[in-house]
Amino acid sequence: MEEFQGYLELDRYQQHDFLYPLIFREYIYALAHDHGLNRSILLDNVGYDNKSSLLIIKRLISRMYKHNHFFISANASNQKKKLGYNKNLYSQKISEGFTVIVEISFSLRLVSSLEATETVKSYNLRSIHSIFPFLEDKFPHLNYVSDVLIPYPIHLEILVQTLRYWVKDASSLHLLRLFLHEYYNWNSLITSNNFFFSKSNPRLFLLLYNSHVCEYEFILLFLRNQSSHLQLTSSGIFFERIHFYEKIKYPVEKVFANDFPASILWFFKDPFMHYVRYQGKSILASKDTPLLMNKWKYYLVNLWQCHSYVWSQPGRIYINKLSKHSLDFLGYFSSIRPNLSVVRSQMLENSFITDNAMKKLDTLVPIIPLIGSLAKVKFCNALGHPISKSTWADSSDFDIIDRFLRICRNLSHYYSGSSRKKSLYRIKYILRLSCLKTLARKHKSTVRTFLKRLGSKLLEEFFTEEEQILSLVFPRASYTFTFKKLYRGRIWYLDIFCINDLINYE
C-alpha cells in the first residue's frame, strides 16, 4: 500500500481532508477493476468485463465534468435514451471508485497507526482460518456462549453519518448521499435481503456496513479493555451511557466503589470474555456464570439502540451452555466434545489405569446446507442426486473438467479443518458425477460409456487434491507417514480471505 500513497496523491488531498478530486483519476477505476479480477471465486473465474474498458471510464469522466448532463433524475428515461448511455452502469463505476478511495485512506491510517504503536504486522491473521486455532485454544475452557446477529441500521443516513467520522470530505459524502438516494431506494428500510447481499455494488455496501460495525466494536473493545485492566470491574458504566464520559474524568476506582458495594463486585470480574465476529454474525463466550453473560447481552442491546439507532430484542439473544450447543459459524458446525484417553501408570509393582476426559473443539462439514447450496447452482437436486450442469455443456472438455476440479479443490482447501472427512467425500462424489453427466450430455452419450472411454484419470483427479497439497508442505522423506497421520486430522490454511456463496449458504 505504500507504493500507492505517492501515486494516488493522497498526501496532498488528506492534508485538507479532500478526497473528491480523486474520483476524476482513471487509475482509481483501474484499481477497482483489478480488485474484482483478483478475488478468490469458487464457482468460476471472473473474465474480463467489456463494460470496464478504459474507453468507458474515459467517457464516464468526461460526462462527470459535464455535470449538467450527467446527474439526471431516475425517472427521466427519455433523456437517458437521448444521451445514449447507461446511467446505472456509470453510477456503479463511480461508486466503485469512491469505495477504492475510502478503502485506501483507511489502509494508510491503519499502517500509520501500526507504525506509531510499533505493532508487528501479521498478514496471516487476515485469513479466515486463523480464527479456528483461537477457538481451539480458548473454547474448551469456556462454559457459556451466545450467538449474536448484529442488527442493521434502519436508514441509510445512519451509515453516512457513521462514515463521516472517518471521511472528513463533505463533497464526497454528498456524492455518496446522491447515489444512495437515486439508485438504492433511500427511503426504504434496510434488511439483509436488500442491503448486505446487494448484487448491484456489494463492495460499497460492505464498506458502509463494516464502518458501521467498526464503530460499535470500537466502543465495545474500549470498554472491554478498560474492564480487563482494572482489578475491580463493574458493569455500572454500561447501563449509564449518559454519564459515562463524565465518569471517565474521575478515578475509575472511586466510581466503582461508589456504585457497587465490595461484596458484589466479584460478579463483574471476567477475564475470560471472548468476542468473535464474521460479517453480521458474532459469538460471545465466557467462562463465568450466566449472570454476567446476561449483563453483556443487555449492554449490547442498549449500545445498539442508544448509539447506533437500531432496534434489537434481548429475548432473541440466547445464552447456551457450550457443552450442549453447536455453533454455526464460518461454514462449520463447531461444538465441544469430550476427548477420552486411557493412561496406564506403573508404580513399582502396582499399575494404574486412568481415564482422562479432555474437552476438544469438534468442527464438522454442514452437509445438508452444503448440498442445498449445490442444488441452488444446479449441481444436484434437493435430495443430493447429481445432475448435469447444462449451462456449461457448450464449453470445451478441458474447461468443464477444470471448473469442476477448481470447485472441488477449493472446497477441500476450505474444509481441510473438518474433524470428519466423510461428508466431504460425499460432496466430491456429487461434483465428480455431475462432471461426468455434463460431459456425457455434451457428447450425447451415457455416463457409463463416456467413463469407459475416458478411463480412471478423472476419478483420480478428484481424490488426490489433499495429497498434492500435503506434498508441497512436507518433504518427501516424511511424506508417507505424515499424510496418513495428518489427512485424518485438521489443517488450517492462512491464505483464505473470503467465503464464496457456495459456502456462505446463510
Swiss-Prot record:
GO terms for molecular function: RNA binding. Keywords: Chloroplast, mRNA processing, Plastid, RNA-binding, tRNA processing. GO terms for cellular component: chloroplast. It is found in: Plastid, Chloroplast. It comes from the Eukaryota. Usually encoded in the trnK tRNA gene intron. Probably assists in splicing its own and other chloroplast group II introns. This is Maturase K. It comes from Prunus persica. The lineage of its organism: Eukaryota, Viridiplantae, Streptophyta, Embryophyta, Tracheophyta. The gene is matK.
